[in-house]
Amino acid sequence: MAGFKVEQDCPQCGGRMNLEETDRLVACTYCGVKNFLYSPGLFRFVMGHNAPGKEIVYVPYLRFKGTVFSCRIQGVSHRIVDFSRLGTPFRNFPFSLGLRPQALKMRFAGPDIQGRFLKCFLTSSDLLEEVTRQTPVERDDSVFHRALIGEAINLIYLPLYGEKGILFDAITNKPIVRIPEKGDVFSTVADSRSVWRLIFLSTLCPKCGWNLEGER
């Protein structure tokens, strides 16, 4: 199951690193320094946009990627899932991200990203319950146990912008929905990014200074 690509600048030399979605132990190809990526909460990613000069509004989507195993009378079956859902109460926005996470490169979200971020009201528990509900079950087929294995849950932000009372997709620049031209419809759901942190932990041995090795 394909994940998405992430662009990140090396905290040591500033060189561009191209990462996989699940990479946590990363090595810079320029300076060779290795770091372990850590976030206190969910990892947050933003999609790049094609609307320079516009005031971007980032809409949150909660995404699950993993395998759903079901234990039935006939045996154990599994289903690979890549599932995203809109995290705000604005139901006129796209309901899911579709294949965009796999098709577009992303960056980690943080205080350095210009624009306004909306709060995510959907919880991880809500998303996992929906993933379970979406798993097909044959009529009169009893499921004794269901497990989600290797799951990765993260937040992905879709960039939008408003112009003349219309909200546009900032990737395709196509209109999505009309919004009031006066007033701020997003003021009550704006999120604070002051606590968003992507932490780089050095992988050098604290005693001898040698590089520690590990899986990505």
Task: Annotate the PLM regions.
Residues 1-216:
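A composition-biased, non-transmembrane "mature-region" signal
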